[in-house]
Amino acid sequence: MGPSGSGKSTFLRCLNVLEDPTDGYVFFEGNNLCDLKVDINVQRRHMGMVFQQFNLFNNMNVLKNITFAPVHIGMQELRAAKLKNFKIKFLNLFKSKDKKQPVPPLQTSKKQIVEEAEQNAMRLLKRIGLEAKANVYPSTLSGGQRQRIAIVRALAMSPRVMLFDEPTSALDPEMVGEVLALIKELADEGMTMVIVTHEMGFAREVATRVLFMDGGKIQEQGTPEQIFGAPKNERLKDFLSKVL
């Protein structure tokens, strides 16, 4: 948390290298994301990102929005498996019978990839009570509905961490509660999350650790009890006096 322009969103975007850090490193599950040898796209598959403005694909219905990434990744993996098998078959042409390498069977198909992605999408939509909206387009939905679908879209990739960039800042006040309730559910289930937020009450209730940023630096960090109950940094004290 912190005032506008303090670097919160930039910090968040550096975590999955949507922004290149000017100094230092970002490690995710032992991998240095700033190392050019690391395939950042593979690492990003395990990071869900939810933006302020939803960033849904307006030319796709809700179901397509949710299944797009899982189907795309599934098809990439299927093509890689087919290419690997083709290489084995080709090399086997030049080997004697006793030295031919067995060709492993494909574990999936395009039809299966699409069906599994759609089943998972419908399960997630049912969880948030929006299964009836599967075939509608984002432009027909409320802000709260669009943001919940954006969260579900990220969850469809089974991420190991979720990054939220002010997920309620573009919502009408009465829509905020339904989005925060979903995020709280994820917290209760043990999902690792990094959330940029101005919802102080929510941060106090849900967070296990709070960072206060100002001027592009972390000025103070600690448990919610420490940050909200006994702040030490003068800038943090001033900030809390204005927002609480």
Question: Where are the regions a protein language model picked out?
Answer:
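ABC family nucleotide-binding domain
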Residues: 1-224
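C-terminal boundary and immediately downstream tail of ABC-type ATPase nucleotide-binding domains
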Residues: 221, 225-244
